[in-house]
C-alpha cells in the first residue's frame, strides 16, 4: 500500500502523528548525511596529519635536527590527536542519530500496523494467571506489544507486572500513574531520546 493509502486509513490524530514522525525521520536523515560527510573529512585529516608527523620525524632523524622540524612534528601530532577526538565525537553523534531515526521509523511502522520492532512479551504468558493466558495481553499483536516502549528488562518486567495486576489500587495511585503517562506523552523529544539510548544499548549487547 502506498503512502496516500496508508494516510487515508489513519484517523486525523494518527495522520498528524504519522506525518510528524516522517518529518522527524527525514530531518534526522539529513543530519546523518552531514555527519557522514564530516566523518570523511576527519578521516582524511587523520591520515594527512599522521603522514606529515611521520615525515617530520624522519626529516629530523635523517637530515635536519632543527627546532622548526621538531615544532612541525609536534604540531602535526597534536593535529592528529585533535582530528581523532573530533572523529570519535562525530561517530558517537552519528550512532545517536541513527538510533533516533530508528525510533521514528519504528513508530511510523507501528502506525502502519507493523509491530515487529517492539517486544511482544511472550515470556510473560502464565497459563495459571487469571486472565493473562486467555486474553491478548501478551504475544503477537497483544496489548503489551502495542504499548511497550521499554528499553530495559527491568522496565519490561514492570510493565508486564502492571498488566497482570489483579489487586485493587487507590484512586491516588491511579491518578499519579495517569499524570505520569500524560507528562511523558507531551514530551516527544524526551521519549525519543530515551528510546534511542535503549536502541544503542541493545546494539552493544
Give names to the regions the model predicted.
Residues 1-43, 47, 53, 60-63, ...:
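Switch/coupling subdomain of P-loop NTPase systems
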Amino acid at each position: 500500500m502506498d503512502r496516500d493509502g496508508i494516510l487515508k486509513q489513519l484517523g486525523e490524530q494518527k495522520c498528524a502523528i504519522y506525518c510528524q514522525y516522517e518529518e522527524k525521520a527525514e530531518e534526522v536523515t539529513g543530519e546523518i548525511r552531514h555527519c557522514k560527510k564530516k566523518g570523511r573529512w576527519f578521516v582524511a585529516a587523520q591520515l594527512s596529519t599522521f603522514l606529515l608527523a611521520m615525515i617530520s620525524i624522519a626529516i629530523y632523524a635523517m637530515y635536519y635536527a632543527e627546532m622548526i622540524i621538531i615544532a612541525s612534528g609536534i604540531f602535526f601530532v597534536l593535529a592528529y590527536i585533535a582530528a581523532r577526538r573530533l572523529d570519535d565525537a562525530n561517530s558517537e553523534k552519528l550512532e545517536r542519530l541513527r538510533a533516533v531515526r530508528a525510533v521514528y521509523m519504528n513508530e511510523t511502522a507501528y502506525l502502519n500496523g507493523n509491530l515487529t520492532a517492539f517486544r511482544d512479551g511472550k515470556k510473560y504468558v502464565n497459563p495459571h494467571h487469571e486472565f493473562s493466558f486467555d486474553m491478548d495481553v501478551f504475544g503477537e499483536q497483544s496489548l503489551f506489544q502495542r504499548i511497550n516502549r521499554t528499553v530495559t528488562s527491568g522496565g519490561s518486567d514492570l510493565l508486564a507486572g502492571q498488566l497482570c495486576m489483579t489487586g485493587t489500587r487507590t484512586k491516588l495511585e491511579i491518578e499519579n500513574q495517569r499524570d505520569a503517562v500524560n507528562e511523558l506523552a507531551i514530551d516527544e523529544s524526551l521519549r525519543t531520546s530515551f528510546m534511542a539510548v535503549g536502541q544503542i544499548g541493545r546494539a552493544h549487547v
